[in-house]
From Swiss-Prot:
Subcellular localization(s) per the UniProt record: Cell membrane
Record has Cell membrane as a keyword: yes
Positions of the propeptide removed during maturation: 86-114
Lipid attachment, kind GPI-anchor amidated serine: 86
Function of the molecule: May be involved in the regulation of cell proliferation. Has a cell-proliferation inhibition activity in vitro. May act as a modulator of nicotinic acetylcholine receptors (nAChRs) activity. In vitro inhibits nicotine-induced signaling probably implicating alpha-3:beta-2- or alpha-7-containing nAChRs.
CDD domains, A to Z: TFP_LU_ECD_PSCA (cd23573)
Subunit structure: Interacts with CHRNA4.
Induction conditions: Down-regulated in gastric cancer cells.
Keywords: Cell membrane, Disulfide bond, Glycoprotein, GPI-anchor, Lipoprotein, Membrane, Signal
Name under which the protein is recorded: Prostate stem cell antigen
Organism: Homo sapiens (Human)
Taxonomy, superkingdom: Eukaryota
């Protein structure tokens, strides 16, 4: 099915990046030269705070989503030019503030006061 998006003599174009924390850092375009390749995006979120994004071309892309104790992994595949543009926000502001509150408490009052 992925090959249907390709016309003879053309290649699929996908955004490409490795382990970026912002979708804005994933603007490099990769030329997928093998017939049947798809664009993919992987988002790995650790404890709701930090999201790492990777993108590129793949012959064996499979949509996948897994929840782990410390985070979540999500892989999406698509087969049209630059279809893997969307990413995830690198840091959720409210979650970051909530996560930093205990550390701030330790700095201000010390470990014995918490």
């Amino acid at each position: 099915m992925a090959g249907l998006a390709l016309q003879p003599g053309t290649a699929l174009l996908c955004y490409s990046c490795k382990a970026q924390v912002s979708n804005e850092d994933c603007l490099q375009v990769e030329n997928c030269t093998q017939l049947g390749e798809q664009c993919w995006t992987a988002r790995i979120r650790a404890v709701g705070l930090l999201t790492v994004i990777s993108k590129g071309c793949s012959l064996n892309c499979v949509d996948d989503s897994q929840d782990y104790y410390v985070g979540k992994k999500n892989i999406t595949c698509c087969d049209t030019d630059l279809c893997n543009a969307s990413g995830a926000h690198a840091l959720q502001p409210a979650a970051a503030i909530l996560a930093l509150l205990p550390a701030l408490g330790l700095l201000l009052w010390g470990p014995g006061q918490l």
